[in-house]
A protein has these predicted regions:
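Conserved phosphate- and dinucleotide-binding cores of soluble alpha/beta proteins
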Residues: 2-147
Length: 147
């Protein structure tokens, strides 16, 4: 893939450091590739997506290879999460998605790497290593820019 000048997308959650949770739609791996391939990553959200602690409200999507789903889920439970298989759904890459509920993410950068080191994980929906460069947030009365 060639370098992109910019990449514009939404997020399921964001914090003041412009770290994100994405992947509710199941395209997290391709979205992360696009974010890494862009000079500027612009995220457009509404105010309901803001949180002080990622993962508190929205589940973290993790793309897994089918044969590893149970093993990955056991590891995620050891880490304190409640993994739930997204039944009847496949990612854009034909893999399965496990959504991890009740999984507050205190240090997103570290957890992103830790989850990706579990054998069978393709990618997870934490965008902390490649976080947004700009967040455009719409409220009922205004548009705020976090850059």
């Amino acid at each position: 893939m060639h370098s992109l000048d910019f990449y514009v997308d939404g997020a399921d959650e964001y914090n003041d450091l412009k770290e994100l949770i994405k992947g509710g739609g199941g395209a997290l791996t391709r979205e992360k590739i696009l974010a890494y391939s862009s000079e500027s990553f612009i995220c457009i959200v509404d105010e309901t997506k803001h949180t002080d602690l990622l993962g508190r409200e929205f589940p973290l999507a993790i793309e897994v290879i089918e044969i590893a789903r149970s093993a990955v889920s056991r590891e995620l439970m050891k880490m304190g999460g409640k993994p739930i298989f997204r039944n009847g759904f496949t990612s854009d890459n034909g893999n399965q998605i496990v959504d991890v509920h009740n999984f507050p993410i205190e240090i997103p950068y570290e957890l992103e790497a830790e989850i990706n080191n579990i054998p069978g994980v393709v990618e997870n929906g934490i965008f902390a290593k490649r976080k947004a460069d700009v967040i455009i947030c719409a409220t009922d009365n205004s548009i705020n820019i976090l850059d």
